């Protein structure tokens, strides 16, 4: 039986401008679905695990379409709550070269934003699970979402389920009177695995890497050991801290890597040059999906788990949409050094 992983968050309607058009130019939008924790669940399903996505959906046709999307990708939906008036939306303007991408959120009063404690039966949702994952996006949406997320973390801790979080700082979401420093520490205190990047660590916990300037297009992996150490000192339950390393040469060209620290040793993944980004949205989620799979599959090999996560995420940058539609075999092929992109016949 494949391993059960539970993720909690919001799946949204994604409305993206086609062909790199700006919002002001667009007369139509490409409609798909996605959201941080849902994206992780889809990755895990593609890798043969048994993910369950926990959320709250409205009882209308848009909610049904989101539900159908999850099921189409073999994501379990057994513990979803239903109610509320609407599904959250985000609008995406894809950047190119020197123009960065833009996201506009329309998530106020969504079904997930209006969720309240007691709406999710966490005991049932986490029954038989080996892993529970959430991101810093969810508690940024509303106090209710933060409270329910904390319910999930505490229930997972009580059951001995491994808990991971992606800090995922989003400045445009914290609008209900609380700041990350008010909410995140209690949530992250229950985590065994913490993922972030240099901005997350700084904005959420005022943790600063040394000797790093991402605007120069180069990041030094060793400089992040201090970030990992500080995270693990602040949150002693954590057994691993992981930092994604993105060097932004332009909106179309990034370098991509990551480091993992287990409290004793710093592991560094190979660096990939992604010279023609198709869609970077979901890049961090694909990393997390790869990392969870890697840590569950290569339980005694953190280096292999990290390498899998970075390679999986590298491939995601070539795929349109939120979801990372790749297989284990494709990721392992890239890990093995085949980055040719040649036609497979």
Where are these regions (language model features)?
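Conserved post-catalytic alpha-helical subdomain immediately downstream of the catalytic base
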Residues: 267-338, 345
């Amino acid at each position: 039986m494949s391993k059960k992983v539970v993720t909690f968050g919001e799946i949204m309607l994604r409305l993206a401008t086609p062909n790199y058009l700006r919002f002001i130019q667009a007369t139509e939008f490409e409609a798909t679905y996605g959201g941080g924790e849902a994206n992780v669940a889809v990755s895990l399903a593609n890798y043969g695990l048994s993910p369950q996505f926990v959320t709250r959906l409205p009882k209308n046709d848009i909610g049904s379409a989101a539900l159908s999307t999850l099921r189409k990708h073999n994501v379990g939906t057994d513990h979803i709550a239903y109610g509320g008036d609407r599904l959250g939306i985000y609008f995406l303007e894809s950047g190119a070269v020197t123009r960065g991408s833009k996201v506009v959120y329309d998530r106020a009063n969504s079904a997930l934003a209006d969720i309240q404690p007691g709406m999710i039966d966490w005991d049932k949702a986490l029954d038989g699970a080996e892993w529970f994952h959430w991101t810093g996006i969810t508690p940024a949406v509303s106090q209710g979402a933060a409270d329910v997320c904390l319910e999930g973390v505490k229930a997972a801790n009580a059951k001995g389920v491994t808990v991971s979080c992606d800090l995922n700082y989003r400045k445009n979401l914290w609008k209900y009177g609380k700041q990350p420093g008010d909410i995140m520490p209690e949530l992250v205190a229950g985590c065994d695995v913490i993922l972030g990047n240099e901005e997350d660590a700084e904005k959420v916990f005022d943790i600063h890497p040394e000797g790093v300037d991402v605007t120069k297009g180069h990041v030094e992996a060793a400089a992040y050991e201090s970030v990992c150490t500080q995270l693990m000192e602040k949150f002693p339950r954590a057994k691993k801290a992981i930092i994604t390393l993105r060097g932004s040469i332009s909106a179309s060209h990034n370098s991509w890597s990551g480091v993992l620290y287990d409290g004793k040793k710093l592991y560094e993944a190979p660096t990939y040059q992604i010279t023609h980004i198709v869609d970077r949205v979901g890049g961090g989620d694909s990393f997390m999906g790869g990392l969870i799979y890697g840590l569950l599959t290569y339980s005694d090999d953190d280096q292999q788990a990290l390498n899998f996560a970075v390679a999986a995420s590298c491939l995601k940058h070539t795929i349109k949409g939120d979801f990372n539609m790749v297989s284990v075999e494709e990721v392992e092929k890239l890990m093995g050094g085949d980055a040719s992109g040649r036609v497979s016949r």
